[in-house]
């Protein structure tokens, strides 16, 4: 371990000294911006949403595009709910250049775009009574995101815009939250015109990568390793490494591979000039309990509520000795789904099972070359995915 540390220090020293190993490219200005600053850079506002259990979520809005900025009339509303567990925040919808980011593309197409954040990530770390230093603050998983965060966000957006319905777009865990919420709360589903599921993760039976390996460890060991509070929060060290190391020509690929190790490899489809922007905004953090919940999905081979570890604790939370199962077969909402053939998390075999369980599936497309991150950062995402999303929204308008 000491030898590894010395090697890392040696490499970093060479890079910072501007030695013979290569050159340092200019830092992208957006690498030093948070999501609010990125959006405000384009002239758009931020909102705060309070959930029923007291969490305060940051929601970002792009009310108009570049071509329709003087159009003040009502527009169809889109809610982008990225929430991939412990890696991302709303910035991921806008961290590519404007003509390659779904948030900006939808705004330019005439939609009122809202982008949400989960409790516990960089932009949703406030609570009415709790502090992030308290264990109680971090006692949540995607159960609470589906039960509280998504309904609060949708209701706030509809109230603010005066609309009766909106389009909901989710990626990864954002889809998990949507499927749970819309199947458990039919009244909430009625407020959504159509659900767009990008690389949905509802089971990990055929998945591969680090998450599957973590899933083999006992819950108590995971808590011993990571504590009981936050997991992979955004940090000053990560930002420093992103802006000082990931801008170096020979290090960009290494920084990009950090993401690929989790989600699958497709290096040719990533904008390498934006790696420092990606890495300064990811990871954005979540709770250890949320991470443990996902490892339970791996262990038990089914999507169910969080297992509190004993019959007594489960009975206290659920009035039964075991966690209740989630069934999406009850969801009555037009749904379009896209999947990737090289996605390590939303594996094709898991997706094929999911497709048989969606009662109102109206569209599905598999993109054979794509991994989990191509849906948000892929260079070819506009013409292979985003244009189809816009077309379907206008069709179901």
From Swiss-Prot:
Coiled coil: none annotated. Residues 1-25 form the signal peptide. PANTHER family: LYSOSOMAL ACID LIPASE-RELATED. The keyword Secreted does not apply. Residues 84-378 form the AB hydrolase-1 domain. One of its GO terms (biological process) is endocytosis. GO terms for cellular component: intracellular membrane-bounded organelle; lysosome. Monomer. Keywords: Glycoprotein, Hydrolase, Lipid degradation, Lipid metabolism, Lysosome, Signal. The keyword DNA-binding does not apply. Belongs to the AB hydrolase superfamily. Lipase family. Residues 26-72 form a propeptide. It is found in: Lysosome. Glycans are attached at residues 34, 99, 159, 271, 319. Catalyzes the deacylation of cholesteryl ester core lipids of endocytosed low density lipoproteins to generate free fatty acids and cholesterol. Hydrolyzes triglycerides (1,2,3-triacylglycerol) and diglycerides (such as 1,2-diacylglycerol and 1,3-diacylglycerol) with preference for the acyl moieties at the sn-1 or sn-3 positions. The active site is at residues 172, 372. Glycosylation is not essential for catalytic activity. Its EC number is 3.1.1.13. GO terms for molecular function: lipase activity; sterol ester esterase activity. It catalyses: a sterol ester + H2O = a sterol + a fatty acid + H(+); cholesteryl (9Z-octadecenoate) + H2O = cholesterol + (9Z)-octadecenoate + H(+); a triacylglycerol + H2O = a 1,2-diacylglycerol + a fatty acid + H(+); 1,2-di-(9Z-octadecenoyl)-glycerol + (9Z)-octadecenoate + H(+) = 1,2,3-tri-(9Z-octadecenoyl)-glycerol + H2O. This is Lysosomal acid lipase/cholesteryl ester hydrolase.
């Amino acid at each position: 371990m000491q030898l590894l540390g010395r090697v890392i220090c040696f490499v970093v020293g060479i890079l910072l000294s501007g030695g013979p190993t290569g050159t340092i490219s200019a830092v992208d200005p957006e690498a030093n911006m948070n999501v609010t600053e990125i959006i405000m850079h384009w002239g758009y506002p931020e909102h705060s949403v309070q959930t029923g259990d007291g969490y305060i979520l940051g929601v970002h809005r792009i009310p108009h595009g570049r071509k329709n900025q003087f159009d003040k009339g009502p527009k169809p509303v889109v809610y982008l709910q990225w929430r991939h567990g412990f890696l991302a925040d709303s910035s991921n919808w806008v961290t590519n250049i404007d003509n390659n980011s779904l948030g900006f593309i939808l705004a330019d197409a005439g939609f009122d775009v809202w982008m949400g954040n989960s409790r516990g990530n960089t932009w949703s770390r406030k609570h009415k009574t709790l502090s992030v230093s308290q264990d109680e603050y971090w006692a949540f998983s995607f159960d609470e995101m589906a039960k509280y965060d998504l309904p609060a966000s949708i209701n706030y957006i509809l109230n603010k815009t005066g609309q009766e319905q909106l389009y909901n777009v989710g990626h990864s865990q954002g889809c998990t939250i949507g499927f749970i919420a819309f199947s458990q709360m039919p009244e909430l589903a009625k407020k959504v015109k159509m659900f767009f599921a990008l690389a949905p993760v509802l089971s990990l039976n055929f998945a591969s990568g680090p998450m599957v390996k973590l899933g083999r460890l006992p819950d108590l060991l995971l808590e011993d390793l990571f504590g009981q509070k936050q997991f992979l929060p955004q940090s000053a060290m990560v930002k420093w490494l992103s802006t000082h190391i990931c801008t170096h020509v020979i290090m960009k690929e290494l920084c990009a591979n950090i993401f690929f190790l989790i989600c699958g490899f497709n290096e040719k489809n990533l904008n390498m000039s934006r790696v420092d922007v990606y890495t300064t905004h990811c990871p954005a953090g979540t709770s250890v309990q949320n991470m443990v919940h996902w490892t339970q999905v791996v262990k038990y081979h089914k999507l169910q509520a969080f297992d509190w570890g004993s019959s007594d604790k489960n009975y206290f939370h659920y009035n039964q000795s075991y966690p209740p199962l989630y069934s999406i077969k009850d969801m009555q909402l037009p749904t379009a789904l896209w999947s990737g053939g090289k996605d390590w998390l939303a594996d094709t075999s898991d997706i094929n099972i999911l497709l048989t369980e969606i009662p109102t599936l109206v569209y599905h497309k598999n993109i054979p070359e794509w991994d989990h991150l191509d849906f948000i950062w892929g260079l070819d995402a506009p013409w292979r995915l985003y244009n189809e999303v816009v077309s379907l929204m206008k069709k179901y308008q």
